[in-house]
Amino acid sequence: MTGDDEPDPEVIGVRRGMFGAKGSGDTSGYGRLIRSVALPGSSPRPYGGYFDDVVDALESALGHDVFAESVERVVVYRDELTLEVHRDRLVDVAQTLRDDPDLRFELCLGVSGVHYPDDADRELHAVYPLMSITHNRRIRIEVAAPDSDPHIPSLFRVYPTTDWHERETYDFFGLIFDGHPALTRIEMPDDWVGHPQRKDYPLGGIPVEYHGAEIPPPDERRAYS
């Protein structure tokens, strides 16, 4: 996402070309394209629809001061409400979203890892889509951690269905979910080095002979950012 159409976007980097590739020629026709890489900024009130009701109910349940310390930013982007939450407050916020009768987000639908190498001190993100069956509502909570300290509290005791989702996010992105009952790799071998869905993970591969020419593996001829 570029975020250029959002209020006060947070610019975290610059992308050159169609795909941000480096190390070889660009065949897309967009080699000179330069775009800012930005995350959506905080959204102003009113958020629209039921989003205001959700934010107001959460602030009322937590208390104004705790809400201000817990929720770093409220973002409405492409008709989705995301609450960016401080990682130390993640469990308390999630439990309130689940248990408060005015909120009742009973289901956590998964965990998505995201790697933003240019988001200084917030390179690793985890996103949790939540659903309220009681009120027929959907929101997301998002939490960030730095590469140097990739620890996030596990939501297993609040939403047990996050069990394998957190394991997969750990496996592919290296986020460590503190308090998880069995945080081990779930798809890659136990002795695998690195986390394959991070943007700094080498593409890998082997040399290939094609029409008499030897083509080097992808990680030697091109890198993406």
Swiss-Prot record:
Protein name: NADH-quinone oxidoreductase subunit C
GO molecular function, one term: NADH:ubiquinone reductase (non-electrogenic) activity
Keywords: Cell membrane, Membrane, NAD, Quinone, Translocase, Transport
InterPro entries recorded: NADH_DH_suC, NADH_quin_OxRdtase_su_C/D-like, NADH_UbQ_OxRdtase_30kDa_su
Organism listed in the record: Mycolicibacterium vanbaalenii (strain DSM 7251 / JCM 13017 / BCRC 16820 / KCTC 9966 / NRRL B-24157 / PYR-1) (Mycobacterium vanbaalenii)
Organism domain of life: Bacteria
UniProt family annotation: Belongs to the complex I 30 kDa subunit family.
Region ranges (Disordered): 1-20
Membrane topology: Peripheral membrane protein
PANTHER family, sorted: NADH DEHYDROGENASE [UBIQUINONE] IRON-SULFUR PROTEIN 3, MITOCHONDRIAL, NADH DEHYDROGENASE UBIQUINONE IRON-SULFUR PROTEIN 3
Swiss-Prot/TrEMBL catalytic activity: a quinone + NADH + 5 H(+)(in) = a quinol + NAD(+) + 4 H(+)(out)
Subcellular location: Cell membrane
EC assignment: 7.1.1.-
Enzyme class: translocase
Function comment: NDH-1 shuttles electrons from NADH, via FMN and iron-sulfur (Fe-S) centers, to quinones in the respiratory chain. The immediate electron acceptor for the enzyme in this species is believed to be a menaquinone. Couples the redox reaction to proton translocation (for every two electrons transferred, four hydrogen ions are translocated across the cytoplasmic membrane), and thus conserves the redox energy in a proton gradient.
Subunit structure of this chain's protein: NDH-1 is composed of 14 different subunits. Subunits NuoB, C, D, E, F, and G constitute the peripheral sector of the complex.
GO cellular component: plasma membrane
